[in-house]
């Protein structure tokens, strides 16, 4: 019985396609916002009136957040855009816990006309690591 290359190697071909997709997904999901470090975020907050948008869930936010940050969990960002509409022309620094939440939040903001969207590289973990101020609720 003769078989073709594709039939003999179907498992490896599927594994290669899935692996490639997994490698590309983080790059695609983060492309909506520029990543900035803690020092760059501080400059935007202090000198350009940036809105700090915390997209973590309620429990994570209560454990500690940046002073004067606006809390909108990523799951509710579409429903609550009107709350931040006045900041469309300001930089927005997204605070998150590492994962895909920041990429999703940035995509929603960009699609709705927010052009200066930034993700804090490392999220809240890097902010804490650098001993920056945290407010606890």
Residue ranges and their predicted role:
Residues 1-44, 50, 58-91, 101-137:
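Rhodanese-like catalytic fold shared by cysteine-dependent sulfurtransferases
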Residues 54:
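N-terminal glycine-rich beta->alpha transition that marks the start or flank
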Residues 95-97:
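Short hydrophobic segments within beta-strands
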